[in-house]
Structures are given as structure tokens and as C-alpha cells.
Design a protein with these regions (language model features):
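Membrane-embedded alpha-helical bundles of multi-pass enzymes
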Residues: 2-198
């Protein structure tokens, strides 16, 4: 039987993993309007815990980049079936690890800028500026990575092909702008939910 501290510890790992999975699913389905805000809400909710940030990023990339598994089999390149399977899974896990690492680093920035004090007691203007800066940092990071061969899909670009309205909005603010907007929405959902719990 699990004791309360073990249950709490499991939740700290389970929810970030679930958030990453929902985010990864959202980039490949028409349910992004439901899944992505929930995913980013979970990201913000656990952003003060470093391992939670890593778990979210790891599972987001693991699911959203699962198409890498379609590289298998690589037998036409001379690899055996087993070697091809190992190589393909290794590539996917490596990309997922990098995704987790990047979100982990972003989480460190969140910890430094945002979590030094209780966000629910901050004045709205300083809070908004800090959250906008953190969201902008993510968007700029995606923009920089998109210029390299090591970046295939992100929060901004992933949803555009499946939604004509987002595609139109992206013409005005770009994929990075969409990324910033989504992260901002995720934060305010987290903030409103947190305030509602405080006042219950």
C-alpha cells in the first residue's frame, strides 16, 4: 500500500509526463484546442520542479516525433533488421532527451525569474511582463532552432497545417508568435486555476 508521500511523489512525475504526452498528441490531431492548453497548463503548474520540466519535454518530443520510428527498417542501407530497430529507437530517444533538456533549461529560467516569490501575490503588471518574457524566450528559442537541421517541429509550427485560422494568424505573428501566444494562454489558465483554489 502506498503511503501519502509516495502518492505525492508519483503525482509529481505522472502529471508532467501526462502533460508532455497530451502536447505530443495535440500536434498530430484536431484536438489541439483541448489538449495543448491542458498540456501547457500542466507545464506551468510543475515549472518550479526541474525534473517535471524534463519529463514534460521528454514525452512531448517522444510522442510528437514518433514518426521517426517510420525510418525503420533501414535494411536498404545495409543494416540488419535488429540493428535498424535499435538505431531508430536510439534516434527517437536521443531527440526526446534533447527536448527534455531544453525544457529543463527553460525551467531554470522560470525558477530564477518567476518563482522567487509567490506568483499569486505579485502585482499583475510585473507578473505579466515576466511571463511574457519567459514565453518570448521559448518562442525565440524555437526560432533559432528552426534555422538548424536539428529542429523539425515545435509549439508554433506544429499546429498551423491542421488549422486554417491559425495559419492565417501565423501570417501576422509568425510561428514563433503562435508559440508565445500558446504559452501565455497556458500560464493564465494555470494562474486562474490557482487563484480559484486559494479563494475556495
Amino acid at each position: 500500500m502506498l503511503i501519502p508521500t509516495q502518492v505525492k511523489s508519483l503525482k509529481q512525475y505522472f502529471y508532467p509526463c501526462l502533460g508532455g504526452i497530451l502536447g505530443g498528441i495535440s500536434v498530430a490531431t484536431h484536438f489541439w484546442l483541448i489538449f495543448m492548453p491542458i498540456s501547457l497548463f500542466i507545464l506551468w503548474k510543475g515549472s518550479e520542479r526541474r525534473i517535471a520540466n524534463f519529463c514534460w519535454g521528454f514525452f512531448f518530443i517522444l510522442i510528437s516525433h514518433s514518426w521517426l520510428y517510420d525510418l525503420h527498417p533501414l535494411t536498404w542501407l545495409g543494416f540488419s533488421w535488429l540493428a535498424s530497430l535499435i538505431i531508430t529507437i536510439s534516434i527517437l530517444l536521443f531527440c526526446a532527451f534533447l527536448g527534455g533538456l531544453l525544457v529543463y533549461l527553460w525551467g531554470l529560467l522560470v525558477e530564477i525569474i518567476l518563482w522567487k516569490e509567490d506568483v499569486f501575490k505579485m502585482k499583475i503588471l510585473p507578473l505579466t511582463l515576466k511571463v511574457f518574457f519567459l514565453s518570448l524566450t521559448w518562442g525565440i528559442g524555437e526560432l533559432i532552432l528552426s534555422q538548424t537541421p536539428f529542429f523539425w517541429i515545435g509549439l508554433g509550427e506544429s499546429l498551423v497545417p491542421g488549422d486554417i485560422y491559425l495559419a492565417g494568424l501565423a501570417r501576422w505573428i509568425g510561428a514563433s508568435g503562435l508559440c508565445v501566444l500558446q504559452i501565455l494562454i497556458g500560464f493564465w489558465i494555470f494562474y486562474i486555476q490557482g487563484l480559484s483554489l486559494i479563494h475556495i
